[in-house]
């Protein structure tokens, strides 16, 4: 990951789990980056890249997408991610984040408020369920 120069963020379930919210397990790590960053990930993890990839939810999301099948967990990289809201494509950007050490790497994770904003933007059933879990756990600790 040292070869990746573009900004990148862990989003989705992994970021929620890393924010100490108990939502269960996840089967992959979602990475949000730029289109250039997506190319850097493809070079860095080329031996693990899934070929002939078919994506789901193409009517909701578009990006420079790659999936990498690593021994312990899959990594999905979305470069220049956009979400379709009311027929218009909106860029998915992270504006507020914190950094966390993971092994020898420092990773960027959106703040919990930012994760909630992104989940609302995505608006799928699983996103709304995660929002409810976050709200429930925040109430327990406040």
Task: Give names to the regions the model predicted.
Residues 1-142:
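Compositionally biased terminal segments of proteins
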């Amino acid at each position: 990951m040292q070869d990746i120069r573009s900004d990148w963020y862990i989003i989705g379930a992994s970021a929620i789990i890393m924010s100490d919210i108990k939502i269960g397990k996840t089967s992959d790590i979602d990475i949000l980056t730029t289109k250039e960053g997506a190319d850097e990930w493809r070079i860095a993890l080329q031996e693990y890249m899934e070929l002939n990839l078919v994506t789901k939810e193409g009517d909701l999301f578009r990006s420079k997408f790659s999936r990498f099948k690593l021994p312990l967990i899959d990594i999905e990289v979305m470069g220049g991610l956009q979400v379709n809201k009311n027929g218009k494509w909106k860029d998915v950007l992270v504006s507020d984040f914190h950094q966390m050490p993971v092994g020898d790497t420092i990773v960027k994770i959106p703040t919990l408020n930012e994760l909630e904003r992104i989940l609302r933007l995505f608006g799928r059933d699983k996103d709304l369920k995660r929002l409810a879990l976050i709200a429930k756990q925040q109430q327990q600790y406040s």
